[in-house]
């Protein structure tokens, strides 16, 4: 497995195999469901051979580089850098969600569409009835 360039730069003084093994065990992405509709700023930090996503309060979510599992609140646990593209995809999806204003929700949007389609159907029915002799 090849490490991304930024990891090679960060750990150039350490044996690459050690770094890869440690990172393989602890690559975590953590999303807080309650905060998806608020402005969600995220950045990820590489430190002591693990990557962890920071939440919008910039509190470091817990991951243990020496053993154990990721924080219980994880919605996604990615065990290997071979899934690095998925990690970036989730990050991109989170960034897209952050563009949605906090007052806006997907459910209210769907409800609006449903109401609109009902009113359109009613209008069509009225028009059809008015065209009948």
From Swiss-Prot:
GO terms for cellular component: membrane. Its main location: membrane. It is found in: Membrane. It comes from the Eukaryota. Keywords: Membrane, Transmembrane, Transmembrane helix. It is a single-pass membrane protein. The chain crosses the membrane at residues 91-113. Partially overlaps IRC24. This is Putative uncharacterized membrane protein YIR036W-A.
